[in-house]
Amino acid sequence: MALKILFWGTPIYAVPTLEALHRAGHRIVGVVTQPDRRRGRGRQLIPSAVKTRALELALPVFTPEKIRQDHSCQQQLADLGADLSVVVAFGQILPVQVLRQPPLGCWNGHGS
């Protein structure tokens, strides 16, 4: 049974999990990642590895600066109706209301 999954992640470490969920046939209803950051000598805006891969997979991407304070983004994500959230190295603390939203809960993959 394919699940509707909301994926949260930022660095390259999180990309294989996103790809595996996508390959398994689950419906990724959204990908939440950190906003583009300025890096390098030219201070160019560089997207996260997860954002880059999500766009290649034609998945909807959300980049809240601070999810705890962005109530509009929280509502948009709730409206996606995900069955499950999968979090892998997102980089922000998720508010309780976000954690409680999916009926099947949230799964956190941690590298430590």
Locations of regions flagged by a protein language model:
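One-carbon transfer enzymes
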Residues: 1-112
